[in-house]
């Protein structure tokens, strides 16, 4: 595998190097991640996540896996929906992000199971979860196809995968969006997080992520029987929903 190439932002790297490079980015941004999310999206990320939570139709006692759960925004929402009789796992491949998320939830009085987990090799049994979610994490994974197959594997029949991710913006807005992403975003990263390079990577990773229709097909190829998506904020983000029959 070491000889195969993949992208890290706009750069080309060996597949076995990407995970380490992505880890460096998120170790760097973890402490300022929530602040930067608010600044970068003008608070819209909260609206996108709220919409995602309302889409799930969870019931008390359900089991949920939050992949690349980061600072715990979705896990908090899922825990409120499934109640004490339910089960919500907060997972992330990055220890710094997972620590921030765990501590944040503990400070709010929420005790959830956490796992340092690779989405391409999930440490959970087949047909276990009612819902799997991944928000703003899929684009950083080296083998997205393998990760999607793992998400399918751990879902119960009738279970749902929700993928909230940056996507392809409507064409008339591309110029303004590029200016914001590549001129302003790294500057904000430098001023607020003292880290322009990491936010340059994040902007590049968004452009390299599959568009809405491509991701839909990838989910179908991974085994999902029904897939659709909903664009938000002119396509800046899309919520893909896959169902396992």
From Swiss-Prot:
- Please name the GO terms of the biological process aspect recorded for this protein, alphabetically: aerobic respiration; menaquinone biosynthetic process; methylation
Source organism superkingdom: Bacteria
* Keywords assigned: Menaquinone biosynthesis, Methyltransferase, S-adenosyl-L-methionine, Transferase, Ubiquinone biosynthesis
EC number(s) recorded for this UniProt protein: 2.1.1.163, 2.1.1.201
Any Pfam family the entry gives: Ubie_methyltran
Q: Which NCBIfam families match?
A: MenG_MenH_UbiE, PRK00216.1-1, PRK00216.1-5
Described purpose of this protein according to its UniProt entry: Methyltransferase required for the conversion of demethylmenaquinol (DMKH2) to menaquinol (MKH2) and the conversion of 2-polyprenyl-6-methoxy-1,4-benzoquinol (DDMQH2) to 2-polyprenyl-3-methyl-6-methoxy-1,4-benzoquinol (DMQH2).
Output this protein's name.
Ubiquinone/menaquinone biosynthesis C-methyltransferase UbiE
Query: Which organism is the protein's source?
Result: Neisseria meningitidis serogroup C / serotype 2a (strain ATCC 700532 / DSM 15464 / FAM18)
Taxonomic path: Bacteria, Pseudomonadati, Pseudomonadota, Betaproteobacteria, Neisseriales
Name of encoding gene:
ubiE
